[in-house]
Amino acid sequence: MPLFTANPFEQDVEKATNEYNTTEDWSLIMDICDRVGSTPSGAKDCLKAIMKRVNHKVPHVALQALTLLGACVANCGKIFHLEVCSRDFATEVRSVIKNKAHPKVCEKLKSLMVEWSEEFQKDPQFSLISATIKSMKEEGVTFPSAGSQTVAAAAKNGTSLNKNKEDEDIAKAIELSLQEQKQQYTETKALYPPAESQLNNKAARRVRALYDFEAVEDNELTFKHGELITVLDDSDANWWQGENHRGTGLFPSNFVTTDLSTEVETATVDKLNVIDDDVEEIKKSEPEPVYIDEGKMDRALQILQSIDPKESKPDSQDLLDLEDVCQQMGPMIDEKLEEIDRKHSELSELNVKVLEALDLYNKLVNEAPVYSVYSKLHPAHYPPAAAGVPVQTYPVQSHGGNYLGHGIHQVSVAQNYNLGPDPMGSLRSLPPNMNSVTAHTVQPPYLSTGQDTVSNPSYMNQSSRLQAAAGTAAYTQPVGMSTDVSSFQNTASGLPQLAGFPVAVPAPVAAQPQASYHQQPLL
């Protein structure tokens, strides 16, 4: 079953209110009234179809729809009365009257409302009609009095009046045709009048179209609003025979007017208006490039805020255009927001990376500096010895190897001298010639001054006073040979005995001034 079904009354209502109808089809109207009670939603569907035709732009259609509405109210009973007294119907009536429809349509609708209020005044269920009339009167809408219901009476008695008028028109047409036939037989004139008289008659019987008419049958004539039509036969009050540039045929007489003087100017103005409208439509049909314009959005919001919601005026064309343009901006605004969001995410990630880099930099700056191991291996400066004074020999040995000062003879010492916790790997990076003893020239050892204040006993006293006091011959030790000092007694008074470790005894040399030396490690 489809979601949206067609209104079952729409086709019959359109047929009963066709713009080409010259009279009301009461048989069809009564058939519609009979069908209203056959379905549960018949009254609602019928009223909806009728009000759709009441809002038609052709006044003839709206008047026929109001006639059908009055017939349904009079013949369909309470089920239709409840629909007429509903809020939806009251809103439709307000829109028809306030939108300045055709005056005849408004007057007929007002008269029907007054008539229904008089009929329903005893039933409180139908009080909405009277309340609607009262509220519209307060708004300035005028309604006819209850005693002068001419239009409503005409709507009720429309059948008899229209039928009588139709009978009279037919009788007149028959009379005229009989008279013409008698004249043709009695007169001796030519069957066809001269061409000049035909042209004059045509010029004298021209009418102007008030509405557009589209031919449905083959014998009908099609014309547009404002066109001139030559009347060939107007014997029938409702359908005339005429001719224009499209051909010859029948057309409804209420679609034309015989007043040609005032319509000439209006026709030219209408043509100009049509041309202007066409130009505007062409301009509007060319779509302008749409882009995000904050000014247009602000202007649309300003217009919307300035509108009073209580007013029932239609929206201006400027507002409609701005709303259309703003709606077209929607997808572009969404794309722009997505792009901004993406850039924001990228910048946020970049900001995090920059902060991490700055944090790492600050951490490295605040850490204790790591000095190179070579900075601790710089040579230590020793003060030069006094001239003519023997210099004491300081043998030094590390746990990783023997260390001798520059120009010092190699001695084997049991005492260890630690240079600190420096890694030995850094010392092994020195040149290999620093680790060889034979690569250096043997120098005589430094001699001390023979003072008792020396704290380290591992040195050798070469004072001449020791030899004189001992009274023994000096023992000459070959240069470069190691000797065991423990087997000898130190004859110096007040000096402790030497420890038992080998010491190299050099040949006596003259005291010379000693330059400062630098201690270098040997591997």
Swiss-Prot record:
Residues 16-144 form the VHS domain. GO terms for cellular component: cytosol; early endosome membrane; nucleoplasm. InterPro entries: ENTH_VHS, SH3-like_dom_sf, SH3_domain, STAM, STAM2_SH3, UIM_dom, VHS_dom, VHS_STAM2. Ubiquitously expressed, with highest levels in testis. One of its GO terms (molecular function) is ubiquitin binding. Keywords: Cytoplasm, Endosome, Membrane, Phosphoprotein, Protein transport, SH3 domain, Transport. Residues 219-220 are annotated as: Interaction with USP8. Disulfide bonds: none annotated. Signal peptide: none annotated. Its main location: cytoplasm. The VHS and UIM domains mediate the interaction with ubiquitinated proteins. The SH3 domain mediates the interaction with USP8. This is Signal transducing adapter molecule 2. It comes from Mus musculus (Mouse).
